[in-house]
Structure formats: structure tokens, C-alpha cells
Design a protein with these regions (language model features):
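Short beta->alpha hinge that forms the Motif I/post-I loop of the SAM-binding pocket
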Residues: 43, 78, 103-105
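NAD(P)+-binding Rossmann beta1-loop-alpha1 motif at the extreme N-terminus of oxidoreductases
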Residues: 2-64, 68-69
Length: 290
């Protein structure tokens, strides 16, 4: 981490669009870094009042406006489909030299469209902090959410090397443990497996007809661990599943094949096959860098 880069952030003006779980966490992490000038934008007045009371933002607005002309960095922490609409409204106010980024869990054409919407001299560089937690909303936000997290920088050929490096350094200043650079198309394919599928599986497991008041008394750490992410923002995740439809459906088919393989081995009393299947899973789990 470049300490000099991090210290320079303290004098920059940040605008955070969307003060939910991730947006609120950005505000708190930036304040922890010593950033003195943070603007919060959200349609929810109560959230803005709470953030002001907490001292994590200095000004609050409900819509795009002239105040954005002061922002050196704009972080869009809103639904993927809302990013381009916001940028259309914000474009007349964004100053030359500003860096604009997002946190969207599905990229698709968003990075390309957003780059066309920002004014000349400003630059949109897409990003994705892998830093969620159970629950949603500003009340669940915390500065520590980025500590040790993976951060994905998702440039297009139109991005400058300077912007890519800026976002990488910014992620490290937040406390992220690893920064990866990848194309939007590859991002969506991999995220379908590492993020979309686990959330779908957790929701399916806890939505089983077997889930009941009585079954709750038979739940241990394993069930809690596997279903933790079923405490989900249903509106956001419906969008993420549908907008990444092709990749998600492909991963669901792959998962279905694994379940059918497991089912077949149990049905055939294939102990050797089961041991091999489970041992392979244990080995793969150990390969994950935590």
C-alpha cells in the first residue's frame, strides 16, 4: 500500500451515491482514513440524517446537482441499472479530472455505457468490492467491511492506465487484501459461480419445505454458515440474477450435475465414490485464500 497515496485522499472531495450497506461502509472507511470532505446522496432522508448524525458525511443531498462539481471522486453504490440513469443526470455537473466508479455485482455493458456518459476529461472506471455481509442497509454498514476483502478492478480498453492504478491503490487504502484486474465479460462469468450461485443455493436450501419451527432446534453451525447469505436484499439480488441470466443459468446447471452425481453415488451405495467426491471438496476448500 502506498502511504503517500492514502494520505492524499484526505484532501479530496468524495461523493457517495447511495448510502446503504456498501455506500455507508465507504463513508465510514473514508472517514477512518481521515478524509475531510464527504458528500452523501440518497433518496431516503432518514438515512441521510443518520449518516450526518454519525459524522460520516458532511453534506447530504437527495438528487444529482451542482454540488457534484466539487467532487474529485464519485462512487456509485446503487443498483447496476440505476448507475447510467444517475450519470445522465449528473453529467452536466461532473468536473474535468474527476474519477467515477461503481460497486456493481454485474457489469455487462455498464462500464462501456457509463464511459460514454461522463464528460470529457473525467473518467469512469468500474470496480467491485467483494465485501458484503449479512443484512442490508445503512444500519449494517461498517468501515471494517473492506478489511482483507478482495477487490476487482474492471477496466475496458478505453480506460487510462492512470485510472486503473488509481482504483487499485484506492482499494488497498480501504483495507482490501487483494486487488484483481479483469474484463467485464470475464467478471460476470466468474461472479456467477463465486457469488450468484452461493446466494441462490443458500436461498433454495432455506426455502425447502423441510424448514419449519421444529427444524430450527436441529440447526448447528453448518446450516448457519451455509445459509448466512440467505439474509439477502431481495430486490437487488433479483436484478443481479436476471441481468446475469445466461451465466447464472449455466452455473445452476453445473451445480445440478454435481448434486445428481452425489445423489447417484448415495443411491448406488458407492462408498468409494463418495469418499473421493468429499475428499476432493475438502482439498478444494483448503485452496481458498482466506
Amino acid at each position: 500500500m502506498d502511504a503517500g497515496f492514502c494520505s492524499k485522499l484526505q484532501e479530496q472531495c468524495f461523493a457517495i451515491i447511495g448510502m446503504g450497506l456498501i455506500g455507508g461502509s465507504y463513508a465510514k472507511a473514508l472517514r477512518r482514513l481521515g478524509v475531510k470532505n464527504i458528500t452523501g446522496v440518497d433518496v431516503n432522508k432518514n438515512v441521510l440524517q443518520q449518516a450526518l448524525a454519525d459524522g460520516v458525511i458532511d453534506r447530504a443531498y437527495e438528487n444529482a446537482g451542482a454540488y457534484l462539481a466539487e467532487a474529485d471522486v464519485i462512487i456509485c453504490c446503487i443498483y447496476p441499472k440505476a448507475v447510467t440513469e444517475f450519470l445522465r443526470q449528473a453529467a452536466p455537473f461532473i468536473k474535468k479530472g474527476a474519477v467515477i466508479t461503481d460497486v456493481s455485482g454485474r457489469k455487462g455493458s455498464l462500464p462501456y455505457e457509463a464511459q460514454q456518459l461522463v464528460p470529457e476529461g473525467a473518467e469512469f472506471i468500474s470496480g467491485h468490492p467483494m465485501a458484503g455481509r449479512q443484512g442490508n442497509g445503512y444500519d449494517m454498514s461498517q468501515a471494517e467491511i473492506f478489511n482483507g476483502a478482495n477487490y476487482i478492478v474492471v477496466p475496458t480498453p478505453a480506460n487510462s492506465k492512470a485510472a486503473v492504478n488509481w482504483l487499485k491503490n484506492f482499494a488497498l487504502c480501504l483495507g482490501c487484501g487483494h486487488v484483481e484486474e479483469i474484463t467485464p465479460e470475464s467478471h460476470d462469468k466468474i461472479i456467477a459461480y463465486t457469488s450468484n450461485l452461493p446466494h441462490a443455493a443458500a436461498a433454495a436450501l432455506i426455502n425447502s419445505d423441510r424448514f419449519s419451527g421444529q427444524s430450527c432446534w436441529f440447526i448447528g453451525g453448518g446450516f448457519r454458515d451455509v445459509t448466512r447469505i440467505a439474509d439477502i436484499n431481495a430486490s437487488l439480488w433479483s436484478d443481479l440474477f436476471l441481468e446475469n441470466r445466461e451465466n447464472v443459468l449455466s452455473e445452476l446447471e453445473n451445480f445440478k450435475t454435481q448434486i445428481e452425481t452425489l445423489q447417484k453415488m448415495i443411491n448406488e451405495n458407492n462408498r468409494e465414490g463418495l469418499q473421493e467426491f468429499l475428499q476432493k471438496a475438502a482439498c478444494h476448500r483448503k485452496e481458498i485464500v482466506l
